[in-house]
Amino acid sequence: MKVADLEKEVQKQTELRVMYRKRMERTQDYLRYCLQIAQENGILEHIIHSKGELQHSPLSVYNVSSITNSPRIPTHSPKHQHHPNLEAIIDQAKINGWYINPTEIQLEDKIGQGTTAEIHRGTWRGFDVAVKCISPEFFRTNANGVEFFAQEVETLSKQRHRFVLNLMGACLDPPNHAWVVTEYLSTTLKEWLYGPGKRRRDRIVPLPPFKERLTRVIEIAQAMQYLHEQKPKIIHRDLKPSNIFMDFNLHVRVADFGHARFLGDGEMALTGETGTYVYMSPEVIRCEPYNEKCDVYSFGVILNEILTGKHPYIETEYGPAKIAMEVVEGKLRPTLPSRDDGEHLGELIDLIRLCWDGTPSTRPSFDTITRILKSYTNRVLH
């Protein structure tokens, strides 16, 4: 076996160890939750004081539930027995009240289309909601499709931040009813900046005022700081304007956690080429180990885009593959705004350069980014 093959195998085994460790941690969390339910409903106390009886007639969760009139912990559907992560999430959703039956949702107009899902406006229990319907084809052609879906739902279900998309519930029955139900938001950062449609050089809508754009940037940084400072930290891995939604008051919601990854302190990820090339960091393109600083790179591209009002690399005729090659070699970054455009952008330009630096350790944390942006706003705009 060649050295390169051995290295790939080592990387693969390392990735598997990390994945199984995370699954074990999630299972332990779920078991602790079950123990808490048992204690709160007197089930554990009943078992402890009935040990002699248990030798002859073991009490199941169902027996004890009927004795105490407490809620039963849901059983697993045989349909999902090969996907323990999804089973655990279904149980948590039913216990915590965010499991949604597809018949409860009235699907309305399609408002978005991605490579793996359609987004519909809908109504659920009187609320306007957005329903992300994962394509059944995605599960048929992707061996890890159920895991990706389970991860997105699990990640969203744990987030409580005003600038992170709010999960209302989910239909957890892939492949036909893998639906993520969230608050309904009418536009994205991409549409706010450029209007509807594909990338183009010419503007079709006015560029929003500088102060409003800067406010949106700070909100994105705050959302990402929240995600990165969780334990374990959450790496988004696909941060871009089309994955950042906006409410009626134009406040942002960071969304689409289908590529998100949990990392412990000091831990590195190995899965390469995750995300969109235009916003992807060099180390991810090269399939090298990476950490949360890959999101900082993406943010740097977005910050530059918001300041210039131009799509990254729109001035070139390069396709995604060419852009990726030039970025990896350090030859290409989006065109920076001019320092003499009257907005005192020198400090922000320096921040952009740090964010998309080729060396991940040079890039600032989102804590630092947020403080720099707030300080700049207070000095320049107030």
Where are these regions (language model features)?
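Glycine-rich ATP phosphate-binding loop
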Residues: 120-138
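Short beta-strand micro-motifs within the conserved protein kinase catalytic domain, predominantly
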Residues: 168-178
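Regulatory alphaC helix of protein kinase catalytic domains
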Residues: 149-154
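Conserved catalytic-loop aspartate of Hanks-type protein kinases
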Residues: 295
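Catalytic-loop of the protein kinase fold
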Residues: 231-246
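Protein kinase glycine-rich loop
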Residues: 108-115, 119
